[in-house]
């Protein structure tokens, strides 16, 4: 995170009441771990590999404007292909995120943790919630600003039988 980003998160931490968390899980990527450190100072961060952001392959680091003339980009955004060249298949991405969430849930149950926070990338949050959350929403309807997110409730019997989580608030 750049110094301005750290300050922005510190100001947000002072202005917003973040949920209590007995454990902090995170994407292993540096900016998520740093965000966790700012929002939950002094807490140990438990990285979960499967919570990493999407692998955009050849599209990585490029803006949509830079990719406009690239035929594979329009094929990918229109759904003609399921992955950017050299990138991750969208269905595999969702499966991976669900495995990551399940790792966190199982760890919580094994360690008698009832409240936790998960630091993830915006696109990963959107994809995971569009696949698992009620109320049901389109992927684009699960956006959140940096340092913000959603509060979810996991009912063990419902989660283990269907993979469903309930979103009940925003942070």
PLM regions with names:
Residues 26-27, 95, 119-120:
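Short beta-strand scaffold positions
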Residues 22, 112-122:
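Generic beta-sheet signal
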Residues 39-98:
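Phosphate-handling substructures
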Residues 10-14, 94, 98-109:
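Generic structural signal for well-ordered alpha-helical scaffold segments
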Residues 163-171:
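Acidic, His/Gly-rich catalytic cores of divalent-metal-dependent hydrolytic chemistry
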Residues 38, 127-131:
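Active-site signature of alpha/beta-hydrolase-fold catalytic machinery across serine-
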Residues 135-163:
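Domain-level recognition of soluble alpha/beta enzyme cores
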Residues 1-43, 90-91:
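Active-site-proximal alpha-helix that buttresses catalytic centers in soluble enzyme cores
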């Amino acid at each position: 995170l750049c110094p301005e980003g750290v300050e922005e998160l510190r100001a947000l931490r002072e202005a917003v009441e973040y949920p209590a968390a007995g454990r902090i899980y995170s994407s292993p990527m540096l900016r998520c771990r740093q965000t966790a450190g700012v929002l939950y100072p002094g807490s140990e961060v438990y990285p979960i590999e499967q919570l990493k952001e999407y692998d955009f392959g050849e599209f990585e680091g490029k803006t949509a404007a830079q990719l406009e003339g690239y035929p594979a980009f329009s094929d990918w955004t229109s759904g003609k292909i399921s992955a950017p060249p050299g990138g991750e298949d969208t269905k595999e991405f969702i499966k991976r995120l669900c495995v990551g969430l399940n790792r966190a849930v199982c760890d919580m149950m094994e360690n008698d943790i009832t409240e936790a926070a998960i630091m993830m990338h915006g696109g990963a949050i959107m994809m995971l919630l569009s696949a698992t959350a009620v109320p049901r929403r389109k992927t684009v309807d699960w956006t959140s600003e940096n340092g913000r997110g959603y509060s979810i409730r996991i009912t063990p019997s419902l989660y283990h039988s269907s993979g469903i989580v309930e979103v009940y608030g925003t942070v």
